[in-house]
Amino acid sequence: NLIQLSNMIKCAIPGSRPLFQYTDYGCY
């Protein structure tokens, strides 16, 4: 789902780690 993916990316952006490390981080 692109909307869920977009939300996860928006959540990950404030972090300092690369996006690929947020695959199981997510926003729940």
Curated annotation (Swiss-Prot):
Primary site of residence: secreted
Organism placement in taxonomy: Eukaryota, Metazoa, Chordata, Craniata, Vertebrata
Annotated compartments: Secreted
Residues the record lists as binding Ca(2+): Y28
GO molecular function, one term: metal ion binding
Record's catalysed reaction(s): a 1,2-diacyl-sn-glycero-3-phosphocholine + H2O = a 1-acyl-sn-glycero-3-phosphocholine + a fatty acid + H(+)
UniProt key word Flavoprotein: no
Tissue: Expressed by the venom gland.
EC code(s) of this entry: 3.1.1.4
Keyword tags: Calcium, Disulfide bond, Hydrolase, Lipid degradation, Lipid metabolism, Metal-binding, Secreted
Name by which UniProt lists this protein: Phospholipase A2 pseudexin C chain
Catalytic EC class: hydrolase
Described function: PLA2 catalyzes the calcium-dependent hydrolysis of the 2-acyl groups in 3-sn-phosphoglycerides.
